[in-house]
Amino acid sequence: METDLVSRLEEAANRFVIPLRMNEGFDEQALLQLQEEIDRCGTARREGTHVPKRAALTLAEPFPAIEACAWLYEGKVRQRIQEAGAMVSEAVTAALD
C-alpha cells in the first residue's frame, strides 16, 4: 500500500471527523470520499502482502470517533451520524477481509 494512498485516507478521515468533533455538522460529501478512500485501501491490500501500521491505525480510528461525535448532536442528525459510523465500520471490515 503506497504512502500516497494512506495520506489520502488520513485526509479523508480528518475531513469528515474533525467537523463532527467541532460540532460543525455532518458532511455527506466528506463521508462519501472517506468511503472511497477506504475502498481504495481495500483494493491495494488485496494486491499486496500486508497493511502498513500507519494505514491500520488510520482505518481503526474513524468508527469510534464518529460514534463518540454522534452524542454531540440530537435527533435525526445523531441517528444519521451513527448510521455513517456503521457504514464506515462495514467498509473497513470489507477492506481488510
Walk through the language-model features, giving the residues of each:
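Residue-level signal for well-ordered alpha-helical segments
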Residues: 8-11, 15-18, 50, 54, ...
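Secondary-structure edge/capping motif, primarily at the C-terminal ends of alpha-helices
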Residues: 16-23, 41, 45, 69-73, ...
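Charged, amphipathic alpha-helical oligomerization/scaffolding segments
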Residues: 4, 8, 33, 37-40, ...
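Short, solvent-exposed, charged loop/turn and helix-capping segments
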Residues: 39-53
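Alpha-helical rod/repeat scaffolding segments in eukaryotic adaptors/tethers
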Residues: 20-27, 48, 52, 74, ...
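Amphipathic alpha-helical binding modules
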Residues: 58-97
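Short terminal alpha-helical segments
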Residues: 1-35
